[in-house]
Swiss-Prot record:
It is a multi-pass membrane protein. It catalyses: a quinone + NADH + 5 H(+)(in) = a quinol + NAD(+) + 4 H(+)(out). GO terms for cellular component: plasma membrane. Residues 455-479 are annotated as: Disordered. This is NADH-quinone oxidoreductase subunit L. NDH-1 shuttles electrons from NADH, via FMN and iron-sulfur (Fe-S) centers, to quinones in the respiratory chain. Couples the redox reaction to proton translocation (for every two electrons transferred, four hydrogen ions are translocated across the cytoplasmic membrane), and thus conserves the redox energy in a proton gradient. It comes from the Bacteria. Keywords: Cell membrane, Membrane, NAD, Quinone, Translocase, Transmembrane, Transmembrane helix. Belongs to the complex I subunit 5 family. It is found in: Cell membrane. GO terms for molecular function: NADH dehydrogenase (ubiquinone) activity; quinone binding. The gene is nuoL.
Length: 654
């Protein structure tokens, strides 16, 4: 079975090579090739999953060594894959949700002339993400990490004819460079202090402690903080979150892939996989929980003010990943629940984004929710599937988000002390805000009056406009209609996961028992009972829904956004994150550049030019001595001899 692990990666990687290098001859079938190879990878994942289930809980680790990558004396870096319970969970999520997104994209990108290339990029994304989660060492993980960054750049900027898309791709790439630098430094520190960066020796396993278990706390803290910086970049956590909203410039299937199953989950995987390092660095764990708590509130507040349906969901993604990071920062109490919420989030967030794409498909690519309204009558399948995803994300009792989010809130309170109360309160507040902004999205899109009938001009921001439609210069009023079967079938499958995944994982604590041999698990002493936490969570959800209903359900939604409060205006601008970056980083960089230019011109060039001028002046004076007269040379010789005699007499006198 070990030999099948490489095929997991090889299938989408082969698809990427064939589609990107095959040329226009594959335009007619390229999308099906990409979808088929993604599905093949999923089937292989299911086969390997069945094999792991047939093994004992402590024997569910398969490794496949391919070749030695960097063999030098005293050191060896291997290309090897590691399949255990944690990586298996990600494999099924990546390939399963990824295959559904491929199928959805067949219809969604039907009229795009570059569809073959798009599917090549999707396959490349899957292959890179699979390398990331299957790597047996941090160096190979870094290869997958960078591959994900490259593929996201290509997908976000897929419509590069739009300046906004090109800028968004560049922004995502550059912001992630900061996080990537953290990962590279962390790997260097591991090699410096441990002499290796393979998972087995560093992290341990199978009941044996790794090098991290006995390492100095200061060293572990330094490594953990660098890994956290990397996670903040890929998972769009504060302070490296500014790229996520702009990433909506890519086609909607890209948003679903990035926000649900792949890129933004990479940071959570890195933290949980490196649990042995974080467990020995309590200060770093505290920073992780703070980052998660701040981000879950940051993203939720941003989502409350967005009228662009995709950007509202982007704020939601930032917030939900914040929950996962918070749980991962709690240590063994929260690792399992972080991954559980990651999986359930993969179902309902992918479904929500695909539902948003379906709405846009039926609304001439309109993204402004103020130009929607009453669409449930025209898009019944989209309405039901989107509605189930909505109920899951707000934590409606019985649906998947209820189980996973509730467990994280319980774990936060179980942390104990003041820290536990603060983290638990932040998580509860985030639950209320989540219910508010998602109810707002639901009401503005599917309920109320049909505002699109009175919208004579298109919205100025339409990220999913094809080149022909964008340059045509005319506007056809929308005629809302349901999407074709190739788009609705993936939405239905994801809706089923949104409904049942949480309960399936929670019955008998089967998900906890599945991951516990890898992540470990411990039970904290919560100051409040699990029932009280559940009651508080449901109460927060009801409050959020009620407030949103009072504002957007009982009142007409204005076609033009009102000015709003100071917080609302700031949230529309992503809580001024770009302004902050410009003032602190860009403007500071400009001042530093000007200072360096001044130093270069005055000091560096001054020394060089001054030396040259001095040599030139001295040469000019020396040239005057060479006048061609013998008497001048005789006088010079006499003077030199006199000076020599005087110096000799002076030295003897001394």
């Amino acid at each position: 079975m070990e030999n099948l692990i490489a095929l997991l990666v090889a299938a989408p990687l082969l698809g990427a090579v064939v589609l990107l290098c095959g040329g226009r001859r594959l335009d007619r079938v390229g999308h099906w090739i990409g979808t088929l190879l993604a599905a093949v990878s999923f089937v292989l994942g299911v086969v390997l999953f069945a094999d792991l289930l047939g093994s004992g809980a402590e024997d569910r680790t398969l490794t496949q060594h391919l070749f030695s990558w960097i063999p030098v004396e005293g050191f060896q870096a291997d290309v090897a894959f590691r399949l255990d319970q944690l990586s298996m969970t990600f494999v099924l999520l990546i390939t399963g949700v990824g295959s559904l997104i491929h199928l959805y994209s067949v219809a969604y990108m039907e009229h795009d002339e570059r569809r073959r290339r798009f599917f090549g990029y999707l396959n490349l994304f899957l292959a890179a993400m699979l390398i990331l989660v299957l790597a047996d060492n941090y160096l190979l993980l870094y290869v997958g990490w960078e591959g994900v960054g490259l593929a996201s750049y290509l997908l976000i900027g897929f419509w590069q004819h739009k300046p906004s898309a090109a800028t968004a791709a560049k922004k995502a790439f550059l912001v992630n460079r900061v996080g990537d630098m953290g990962l590279s430094i962390g790997i260097m520190l591991m090699f410096l202090w441990f002499g290796t960066f393979a998972f087995g020796p560093v992290l341990g396993g199978h009941g044996e402690a790794g090098l991290a278990a006995g390492a100095d706390e200061g060293k572990l803290t330094a490594i953990a903080l660098m890994l956290l910086l990397a996670a903040c970049g890929k998972s769009a956590q504060v302070p490296l979150q500014s790229w996520l909203g702009d990433a909506m410039e890519g086609p909607t299937p890209v948003s679903a892939l990035i926000h649900a199953a792949t890129m933004v989950t990479a940071g959570v995987y890195l933290i949980v996989r490196s649990g042995a390092i974080f467990n020995g660095a309590p200060d770093a764990q505290l920073v992780v929980t703070i980052v998660g708590a701040v981000t879950l509130l940051f993203g939720a507040i941003v989502g409350c003010a967005k009228d662009d349906i995709k950007k509202a969901l982007a704020g939601s993604t930032m917030s939900q990943i914040g929950y996962m990071v918070l749980a991962a920062g709690l240590g063994p109490i929260g690792y399992v629940f972080a991954i559980m919420h990651l999986v359930t989030h993969g179902f309902f967030k992918a479904g929500l984004f695909l539902g948003a794409g379906s709405v846009m498909h039926g609304m001439n690519d309109e993204v402004d929710m103020r130009r929607y309204g009453g669409l449930r009558k025209y898009m019944p399948v989209t309405f039901v599937t989107f509605g189930l995803g909505y109920l899951a994300i707000i934590g409606f009792p019985g649906l998947s988000g209820f189980f996973s989010k509730d467990k994280i809130i319980e774990a936060a309170f179980a942390k104990g002390g003041t820290e536990g109360w603060i983290l638990g309160a932040c998580a509860l507040l985030g639950a209320a805000i989540t219910a508010y902004y998602m109810t707002r999205v639901m009401l503005m899109t599917f309920f109320g009056e049909e505002r699109w009938r009175n919208a004579p001009t298109p919205s100025p921001a339409k990220p999913d406009v094809e080149p022909a439609a964008e340059t045509r210069g005319t506007y056809e009023p929308p005629h809302p209609h349901e999407s074709p079967g190739l788009m609705t079938i993936p939405m239905i499958v994801l809706a089923v996961g949104s409904v049942g995944a949480g309960a399936f994982f929670s019955i008998g604590d089967r998900f906890m028992h599945w991951l516990e041999p890898i992540t470990g698990h411990s039970h904290g002493d919560s100051p409040i009972s699990a029932g009280a936490v559940t009651g508080a969570t449901v109460a927060c959800m009801v409050i959020g829904v009620a407030v949103a209903w009072a504002q957007y359900g009982r009142r007409p939604v204005p076609a033009v956004a009102p000015r709003g409060s100071l917080l609302t205006r700031a949230a529309r601008r992503d809580l001024l994150q770009d302004d902050f970056n410009h003032v602190v980083l860009v403007r500071g960089g400009e001042h530093l550049t000007r200072s360096l230019v001044y130093v270069d011109h005055t000091v560096v060039d001054g020394v060089v030019n001054g030396t040259a001028a001095s040599v030139g002046g001295l040469s000019g004076r020396m040239r005057r001595l060479q006048n061609g007269f013998a008497r001048s040379y005789a006088v010079s010789m006499f003077g030199g001899a006199a000076l020599l005699v005087a110096a000799t007499l002076l030295m003897r006198a001394v």
